[in-house]
């Protein structure tokens, strides 16, 4: 399970160093092989260890290519999916098209989300956190039954 938000730097070649605390688990789970794709609802990227991504691919393969909405999701997720191999220094290379989609520059937030990471431009991340907190405080959105039962 991946958790926590860490500021990492993107180098001039488009590589980012995975924090040391995650490297061992990624090497155990996937020999350092990951898949990066776009998020359909947020200006960020999703980075999965290969076994977790393969589960997503199986679900996508069950969607109908004849249904326009399902085909659109397949096209966006699979069409942007890019394999990333962690090198000996713990770095992964992000494709230019993916970096552009998320507006990534030098400073990137690597955010653990259970079985994957989100990759955010640092300033966009902080704005998203602010917006999320503001939405919670204003109670604009009704709580789902699951959220009402969640005790922290």
Swiss-Prot record:
One of its GO terms (biological process) is negative regulation of DNA-templated transcription initiation. InterPro entries: MraZ (IPR003444), MraZ_C (IPR035644), MraZ_dom (IPR020603), MraZ_N (IPR035642), MraZ_sf (IPR038619), SpoVT-AbrB_dom (IPR007159), SpoVT-AbrB_sf (IPR037914). One of its GO terms (molecular function) is transcription cis-regulatory region binding. GO terms for cellular component: cytoplasm; nucleoid. Pfam families: MraZ. Gene3D superfamilies: Transcriptional regulator MraZ domain (3.40.1550.20). Residues 5-52, 81-124 form the SpoVT-AbrB domain. The keyword Cytoplasm applies. The keyword Repeat applies. Keywords: Cytoplasm, DNA-binding, Repeat, Repressor, Transcription, Transcription regulation. It is found in: Cytoplasm, Nucleoid. Forms oligomers. NCBIfam families: division/cell wall cluster transcriptional repressor MraZ (TIGR00242). Negatively regulates its own expression and that of the subsequent genes in the proximal part of the division and cell wall (dcw) gene cluster. Acts by binding directly to DNA. May also regulate the expression of genes outside the dcw cluster. Belongs to the MraZ family. This is Transcriptional regulator MraZ.
């Amino acid at each position: 399970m991946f958790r926590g938000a860490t500021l990492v730097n993107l180098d001039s070649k488009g590589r980012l160093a995975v924090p040391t605390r995650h490297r061992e688990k990624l090497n155990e789970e996937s020999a350092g092989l990951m898949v990066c794709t776009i998020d359909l609802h947020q200006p960020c990227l999703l980075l999965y260890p290969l076994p977790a991504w393969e589960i997503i691919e199986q679900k996508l393969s069950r969607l109908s290519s004849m249904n326009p909405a399902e085909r659109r999701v397949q096209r966006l997720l699979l069409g942007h999916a890019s394999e990333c191999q962690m090198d000996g220094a713990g770095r992964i290379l992000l494709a230019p098209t993916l970096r552009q989609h998320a507006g990534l520059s030098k400073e990137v937030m690597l955010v653990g989300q259970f079985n994957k990471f989100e990759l955010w431009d640092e300033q966009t991340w902080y704005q998203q956190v602010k917006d999320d907190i503001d939405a919670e405080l204003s109670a604009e959105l009704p709580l789902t039954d699951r959220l009402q039962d969640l005790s922290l």
